[in-house]
Amino acid sequence: MHAKSLTELRAALDAKECSAVELAQHYLKRIDAARDLNAFVHVDAELTLAQAKAADAALANGEAGPLAGLPIAHKDVFVTRGWRSTAGSKMLANYASPFDATVVARLSAAGMVTLGKTNMDEFAMGSSNENSAFGPVKNPWDTSAVPGGSSGGSSAAVAARLAPAATGTDTGGSIRQPASFAGVTGIKPTYGRVSRYGMIAFASSLDQGGPMARSAADCALLLNAMAGFDERDSTSLERADEDYTRHLGKAWAAGGDAGKPLAGLRIGLPAEYFGAGLADDVRAAIDAALKTYEALGATLVPVSLPKTELSIPVYYVIAPAEASSNLSRFDGVRYGHRAAEYRDLLDMYKKSRAEGFGPEVKRRILVGTYVLSHGYYDAYYLQAQKIRRIIAQDFQEAFKSCDVIMGPASPTVAWDIGAKGDDPVQMYLADIYTLSVSLAGLPGMSVPCGFGAGANAKRPVGLQIIGNYFDEARMLQVADAFQRATDWHVQEPAGV
C-alpha cells in the first residue's frame, strides 16, 4: 500500500480496496516501527483516526474532497489544532495552537488525514535537521547521513514511505535541498503563492510553503489544494486559482511528437552552477539527467547568473535580520518557554530566551540584530537588498533565452551526521544553488535524478528545476516528463 502514489491511493479508496481508517492505521504502524529515524515529533493516533473516520463518511456520502482519505504529514512549522506546534524548538516545546495554519486547513478541507508533525531544524534555521531540540533526523537511504534541512523530517518521512506526502517550507532551500538529499520530489512555489498564515515565521520576505511527495504529479495534486489567495496573509498574491495538473502528460508545444514530448523546451544551464565546488558524482548525475531531457526533445542553452556567489552573503544578512525581528515575540510572557527562576522582568526575558533558543538560532538573532543596528543598517541590510534586486534581474535576463533553468539542487550529496556541526559557514555554502532562487521569489523544485558514487552510492542526487514567476504548472510538466522516462523517483531505500 505504501508504494502507491496519491492518485493510486485515491483510486484504491474509491474502489473500496481499503478504507481511510485502514490506510491511516497502515501508515501509523510504519511510523511507529521507524521511530529510530526520528522523522516525527508528534503523533496522535486518536486524532488521526478520527479524521480518517470522517473521510470515510464523506466518501460514503459522495461528499468527499479531491484528496479525501489520503494521509499527509505536516512540518512542525505549521500550527495545527490538536497537535503540538513546536518549530523544532524548546521555546515552543509544549505550545498548543488554537487554530490551523491556512495550508493545514486547506488540505484538511480537501479531505486529507493528518498523520502527525515532522521534525525540523529549529525555526527552520539549518540545512541538515541537526538543529532540532528533538534530536537529528536520519536519512532513510543511509542512516549515518543527514536528510537535509530544514524540512528534513518531511523528506525522511516521504522517502521512508511513512507518509505518501508531507508539507514543507522553503526560505533558502529548505524544501529543495532535503528533497534532493532524501530522493523525493519537492517544490517551492512562487513567493506569495501559498499562504504563510499560521506558518511560524523565520524570514517573512522569503518563507514559502510547498508540498513534498514521491512524484511531480503528486506535488501538483497537493499544490491544487495548498495554493491560493488568503486575506489573512499580507504577502499572499491575488491570482485566479489554477489546476497544476493541467499540463501533465502533454507535449510542451501544441502538435508535438509523442516521442519527443519536450520538443521546443529551452533549458538554461547557468555556468555558475557547474563550476568549482560541484562534486564530480553530482555533476555526473545531473549531466545524465540533462541527456534524458535532450532525448525528450529539449534544447540546452547556456545562460549566466553572475551574482550567484553573492547570494550567500546577501541571504545571511537579510534572513537573520528578519529572524531577529520575528523571534523577538518569544519572551516568556504570552506563550513559549519561561525560565523557572528570575530576578525581575528583564532577567526573565534574558533567561527564557537563553534557555529556549538553540545555538544556531541565537547565532542568527545576533547577526540579524547587528546588521539592523544604527550605523550598520546602510552598510549591510540596505546593500543586501540592493543586490537582491540585481539577482532577480539576472534571472529575468536569463529567462529571455530559456523556458526553465536547471542545475544541481546541492553541490554535494548528503553529508554524515555531525560532519559540519562545528563549521556553520560550510553548512551555509551547501545552499549556494538554492538561495538565489529564494531571494528572487521564483519557483524552484528538486527531482530525484540519481545517486552519488563510491562511499556515497546510496545517497541521492536532486536536479533543480527553476521557473519564472507563476510557472509552476509548466515546471511540474517538465519534471513529470522526466519521471515518466526514468524511475529514480520510485526507487526506495533498502528495507522499506
Swiss-Prot record:
User: Under the cellular component aspect of Gene Ontology, which terms does the record hold?
Assistant: glutamyl-tRNA(Gln) amidotransferase complex
Entries under Gene3D superfamilies matching the protein: Amidase signature (AS) domain
Q: Which reactions appear under catalytic activity for this entry? A: L-glutamyl-tRNA(Gln) + L-glutamine + ATP + H2O = L-glutaminyl-tRNA(Gln) + L-glutamate + ADP + phosphate + H(+)
Whether Nuclease counts among this entry's keywords is no
Q: Is ATP-binding tagged as a keyword?
A: yes
What's the EC number here?
A: 6.3.5.7
Q: What is one Pfam family matched by this protein? A: Amidase
For the biological process aspect of GO, one term held by this record is: translation
Active-site positions on this chain = K75, S150, S174
Spell out the SUPFAM superfamilies in the cross-references: Amidase signature (AS) enzymes
Question: Quaternary structure per UniProt?
Answer: Heterotrimer of A, B and C subunits.
Q: Which PANTHER family match?
A: GLUTAMYL-TRNA(GLN) AMIDOTRANSFERASE SUBUNIT A, TRANSAMIDASE
In the record, the note on similarity to other proteins reads: Belongs to the amidase family. GatA subfamily.
What name appears for this protein in its UniProt entry? Glutamyl-tRNA(Gln) amidotransferase subunit A
The record's gene field reads: gatA
